[in-house]
């Protein structure tokens, strides 16, 4: 693994591909980068330029949400700042099948780059003030990527940015890279990013990026409600765009394209790409059942925001596939889909002395995927729902899913759901921060009465849960409860938090 013992690349074609993928080495710049930068941009840029504590920054998220664009924008900004082009090396691994012939692709490519482009060892480059910056896109399908990266950053002074669209494989690498890694989870567009992309203005996030502490303070949530009211016009316009087309960048950037075109694009480049490419091969090269993956994902879309039990899954799958499929296999495939970050399984809250009961709640990364896959458009916008009241119940489940995925994507935030237990009513979500818990209930309907807050009130009344207040996420703008322990926030304002 010594740097000076670099092995030649397996083909001249691979070297040509690498050079063409790093056009700045020839004095050129990347063409067609969007002017709008996603929320993760300043964090990645800061980490690359030495502002972070870890040498490796991992950006994970579903396919087609802008991870590669983010890397290219960071590279372009570095070049604008005057960083020498030869210091920057980018590799897009999912477009290099020839790497299958390379035993340790990350290390071999790093040594090749050091010898043939940087022209010196990584240590000498750092001493000369030319520390190498490596951008490794979609590494999750590489065997043993994490141990290779660990060796690289342990032995050589480099900064590395890694992207991946598999939570399972990226998470598996975190153990090898403990203490060397900073993780960012980037999902589809945030509501304020949708507004900026559509030209409605630009708003800074309400939640600071330096920790979860503010979430424990009731005044934070009251302030969030005021924040939403202060930016009402922007918020409602952005939420209407989100309701119509979802939060994938392609859907909002191409507002001129028809929904049918966008749906076809999402089905092919996001859902089928994940099922046919990311999940097609299991352990030891065994192929997974593509049809079963599609059916399990279809159920995830159909029961979004809900917690189906085993019997429902078994019955639906057997009817769809005319085969006797066992629960463990279905559960395994659900976890595979969770690994693609297209949907997240929110587990039931575990409490001391109480055996965990209840099924996982299904939260889809974007309701547009459901609309595309099931060919069933359900609006979230209050005005649209008033015109189509028969869709209100479905919209409620989708709103619950949107809130759950939004919470689950906040790094280091512990989120669970609270199933009905004996005499204790259900609560949609429970955030745990340190010793404190914050229950969250989503009630996406026009009228909310005392019965709709029974779960929040029961949870906050039990001293053992240490929940001084709860949050009620609503459809309408008006305060939905006069209980001083409950802060009501419209879904559109809730999604403006980040």
Positions of PLM-derived features:
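Conserved lysine of the Walker
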Residues: 67
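Short glycine-rich substrate-engagement loop in P-loop NTPases that contacts/grips substrate
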Residues: 91-129
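Interdomain motor-coupling "hinge/lid" segment immediately C-terminal to the ATP-binding subdomain
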Residues: 173-302
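A short, basic N-terminal segment
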Residues: 1-53
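Conserved catalytic segments around the Walker B and adjacent sensor/switch elements
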Residues: 80-95
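Domain-level recognition of nuclease-like catalytic cores that cleave nucleotide substrates
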Residues: 475-498
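Hydrophobic positions on the alpha1 helix immediately C-terminal to the Walker A/P-loop
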Residues: 70
């Amino acid at each position: 693994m010594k740097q000076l013992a670099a092995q030649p690349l397996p083909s001249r074609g691979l070297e040509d591909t690498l050079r063409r993928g790093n056009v700045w080495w020839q004095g050129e710049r990347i063409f067609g980068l969007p002017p709008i930068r996603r929320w993760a941009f300043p964090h990645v840029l800061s980490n690359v330029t030495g502002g972070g504590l870890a040498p490796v920054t991992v950006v994970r998220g579903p396919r087609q949400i802008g991870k590669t664009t983010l890397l290219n924008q960071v590279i372009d900004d570095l070049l604008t700042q005057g960083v020498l082009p030869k210091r920057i090396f980018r590799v897009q691994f999912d477009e290099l099948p020839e790497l299958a012939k390379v035993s340790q692709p990350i290390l071999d490519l790093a040594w090749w780059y050091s010898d043939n482009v940087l022209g010196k060892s990584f240590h000498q480059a750092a001493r000369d003030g030319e520390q190498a910056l490596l951008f490794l896109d979609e590494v999750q399908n590489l065997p043993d990527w994490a141990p290779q990266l660990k060796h690289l950053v342990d032995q050589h002074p480099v900064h590395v940015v890694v992207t991946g669209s598999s939570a399972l494989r990226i998470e598996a690498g975190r153990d090898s890279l403990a203490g060397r890694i900073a993780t960012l989870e980037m999902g589809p567009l945030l509501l304020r990013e949708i507004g900026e992309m559509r030209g409605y203005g630009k708003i800074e996030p309400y939640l600071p990026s330096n920790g979860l502490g503010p979430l424990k303070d009731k005044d934070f949530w009251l302030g969030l409600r005021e924040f939403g009211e202060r930016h009402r016009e922007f918020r409602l316009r952005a939420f209407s765009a989100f309701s119509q087309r979802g939060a994938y960048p392609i859907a909002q950037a191409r507002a001129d394209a028809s929904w049918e075109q966008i749906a076809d694009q999402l089905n092919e480049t996001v859902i089928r790409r994940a099922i046919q490419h990311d999940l097609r091969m299991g352990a030891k090269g065994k192929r997974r059942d593509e049809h079963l993956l599609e059916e399990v994902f279809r159920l995830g879309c159909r029961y979004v925001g809900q917690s189906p039990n085993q019997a429902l899954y078994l019955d639906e799958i057997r009817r769809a596939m005319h085969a006797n499929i066992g629960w463990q296999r279905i559960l395994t495939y659900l976890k595979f889909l969770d690994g693609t970050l297209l949907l997240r399984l929110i587990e039931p809250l575990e409490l001391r002395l109480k055996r965990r009961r209840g099924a996982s709640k299904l939260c889809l990364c974007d309701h547009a995927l459901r609309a595309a896959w099931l060919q069933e458009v359900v609006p979230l916008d209050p005005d649209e729902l008033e015109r189509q009241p028969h869709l209100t119940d479905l919209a409620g489940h989708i709103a619950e899913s949107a809130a759950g995925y939004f919470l689950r994507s906040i790094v280091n935030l512990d989120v669970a759901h609270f199933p009905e237990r004996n005499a204790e009513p259900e609560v949609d979500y429970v955030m745990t921060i340190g010793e404190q818990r914050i229950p969250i209930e989503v009630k996406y309907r026009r009228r909310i009465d005392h019965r709709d807050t029974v779960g929040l009130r029961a949870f906050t009344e039990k001293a053992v849960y240490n929940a001084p207040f709860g949050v009620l996420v609503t459809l309408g703008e008006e305060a939905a409860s006069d209980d001083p322990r409950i802060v009501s926030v419209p879904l559109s304002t809730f999604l403006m938090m980040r």
